[in-house]
């Protein structure tokens, strides 16, 4: 980790995962959280919780993997309508039977991750707001019979930019017998 000395509940410093993590289960709390390396849980039913006050980014071609554990990426946990979840090109979440939940706000299961930042996006012509949940080309969510929930919202304050609650292009979601 870098950027914070603690990653426990209540931490508000930005956190960067800069080396691969392998743990029985894992919880990371922070301001903005950058997942720049692979994360793997080693215990069966061991969950991953990434809870950010603002944004969560899973770097290109990086993976989060569990064995029947839930994966929860929870942005904008202070519920101030400013915090997105972004999976960059080729990133993957594999829960092998656990649920995958991407969202934000006060309650991960009923509120939304919220995009407010603009960027020039290579997948489209022009400028767009980063969506509440933004999954780039080649990303995948594979729950192998767990449920998948993706909840995002956006507030476009400019007529010169596009905005979407969810932005999914060239994305694979496979829940097996689970619900999406």
Question: Which role fits each region the language model picked out?
Answer:
Residues 1-3:
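Extended repeat-based solenoid scaffolds, especially LRR ectodomains
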Residues 5-7, 12-16, 21-23, 31-35, ...:
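Extracellular beta-strand scaffolds
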Residues 113-128:
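Surface-exposed intrinsically disordered loops and tails
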């Amino acid at each position: 980790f870098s950027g914070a000395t603690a990653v426990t509940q209540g931490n508000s410093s930005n956190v960067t995962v800069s080396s691969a993590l392998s743990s029985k289960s894992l919880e990371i709390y922070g301001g903005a959280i950058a997942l720049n390396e692979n994360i793997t849980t080693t215990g069966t039913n061991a969950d991953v919780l990434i809870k950010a006050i603002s944004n969560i980014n899973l770097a290109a071609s990086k993976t989060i993997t569990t064995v029947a554990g839930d994966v929860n990426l929870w942005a904008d946990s202070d519920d101030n309508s400013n915090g997105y979840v972004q999976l960059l090109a080729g990133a993957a979440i594999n829960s092998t039977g656990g649920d995958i939940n991407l969202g934000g706000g006060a309650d991960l299961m009923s509120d939304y991750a919220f995009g407010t930042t603009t960027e020039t996006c290579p997948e489209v012509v022009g400028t767009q707001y980063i969506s509440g949940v933004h999954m780039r080309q080649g990303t995948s969510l594979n729950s192998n019979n767990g449920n998948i929930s993706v909840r995002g919202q956006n507030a476009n304050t400019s007529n010169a930019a596009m905005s979407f609650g969810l932005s999914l292009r060239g994305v694979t979601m496979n829940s097996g017998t689970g619900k999406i």
